[in-house]
Amino acid sequence: MAITDILSAKDIESALSSCQAADSFNYKSFFSTVGLSSKTPDQIKKVFGILDQDKSGFIEEEELQLFLKNFSSSARVLTSAETKAFLAAGDTDGDGKIGVEEFQSLVKA
């Protein structure tokens, strides 16, 4: 499954263009612009499955750093500060990674 099966290419392009500069990534505005915030829990779970590159059932810090590349191979990697802030926002149980329920909560926050 491709991310464009769930989200529109136009929305993805718009969301990526808003965070091209280093340290400009904001997960709330990104999720809103890309259209993920308005998706169903099942659709959000499918996006989680795409982001979970190693299929561990969690999005780990290394996968978060490459978050934008899941939307476009030409996108930048997140900075260390962006990655840590993103992880801190999503990791509500403190295990150092984001599970599917945590991701769904983060998207809807």
Swiss-Prot record:
The keyword Repeat applies. Disulfide bonds: none annotated. It holds the Pfam family EF-hand_7. Ca(2+) 2 binds at residues 91, 93, 95, 97, 102. Keywords: Acetylation, Calcium, Metal-binding, Repeat. The modification N-acetylalanine is found at residue 2. Residues 39-74, 78-109 form the EF-hand domain. One of its GO terms (molecular function) is calcium ion binding. One of its GO terms (cellular component) is cytoplasm. Ca(2+) 1 binds at residues 52, 54, 56, 63. Gene3D superfamilies: EF-hand. This parvalbumin has an isoelectric point of 4.3. Belongs to the parvalbumin family. Appears to promote immune maturation in bone marrow cells in culture. Binds two calcium ions. This is Parvalbumin, thymic. It comes from Gallus gallus.
